Amino acid sequence: MLLLLTAYLSKYHTFFTVFNYLSLRAILGVLTALAISLLVGNKVIVLLQRLQIGQAVRSDGPQTHLSKAGTPTMGGALIIFSISVSTLLWGDLRNQYVWVVLLVMLAFGVVGWVDDYRKVVEKNPRGLPGRWKYFWQSVFGLAAAFYLYYTASTPAETALIVPLFKDVAIPLGMFFIVLTYFVIVGTSNAVNLTDGLDGLAILPTVLVGGALGVFAYLTGNIRFADYLLIPYVHGSGELLVFCAALAGAGLGFLWFNTYPAQIFMGDVGSLALGAALGTIAVIVRQELVLFIMGGVFVMETVSVILQVASYKLTKRRIFRMAPIHHHFELKGWAEPKVIVRFWIITVCLVLVGFATLKVR
């Protein structure tokens, strides 16, 4: 929005041309989203407390979690609001990818909001029934997949890029739609499963989102893309502003969500942020790198799949409790130790993801 205004004002003073620089707008984006989260955060917490929108805690989980009962939840709405405002202010609203990611985030946020509302306000422990949640996730995921497929202008935009190998791009054809669907919906649910401890999901989301912003910047610059042997996707660089806003909003939320948390993001936040990460990874053609950098999300998801499969087949559980962060808690790890160690793992995996740019 402001980019269009400054473009007009630059006719009268050259100072305003500075806002054409993507890097500056990304910095302003992260600062704006951070400021909104920090300034509005306390007010949101007070409002949620007044409305008695508090977290319900499982009685069969770690006993240390019982004290979390009643902690305000649905704070993901604050993250979405901060990202949206910052992106609309500093992003190029003529860019299709900005709108795709924004709309996917908002759509999945609505699904999460309905689920949270039914659980917390209507006191329905099931929330939104799983089949309906998956149905709407599928609708929105497929809508994004079809749009990206039919608006792709080059074959590289729908090919699977294999990291660590030079010039290995697998043409996907219509299978691109299937892959995109699973990446978006899968990442959305993976972040949701990870969001079980104070700050556990939000910092890895910030780290992976920030890294994807760097990939978006490189993919959107034809010189960098050519040098690094990654596909050039015209316009994808503008997603750096969105990723910067995500990082700022996430860090601002972490201020209140760090142990002991004053607020939880709820499904409205985790489903939306996960879907946004998946969509960005698809646009910049780094689905496999997302799998690496988001290793914590993958680990949490796989632990649930293995636990359910093992119990159905053998009536025995592999882990004391799934997702796996609860397993470590029940083994005696203090909650902050689990959280920080998972953060450290994510930092290492993000660095591995960056290394794939040069190791080929």
Swiss-Prot record:
Q: What is this protein called?
A: Phospho-N-acetylmuramoyl-pentapeptide-transferase
Q: Which HAMAP family match?
A: MraY
* One of the Pfam families matching this protein, by short name: Glycos_transf_4
Gene from which the chain derives: mraY
Keywords assigned by UniProt, alphabetized: Cell cycle, Cell division, Cell inner membrane, Cell membrane, Cell shape, Cell wall biogenesis/degradation, Magnesium, Membrane, Metal-binding, Peptidoglycan synthesis, Transferase, Transmembrane, Transmembrane helix
What is the protein's membrane topology class? Multi-pass membrane protein
Query: Which species expresses this protein natively?
Result: Marinomonas sp. (strain MWYL1)
Residue ranges crossing the lipid bilayer per the database entry:
27-47, 73-93, 97-117, 145-165, 168-188, 199-219, 236-256, 263-283, 288-308, 337-357
One GO CC annotation: plasma membrane
Localized where?
Answer: Cell inner membrane
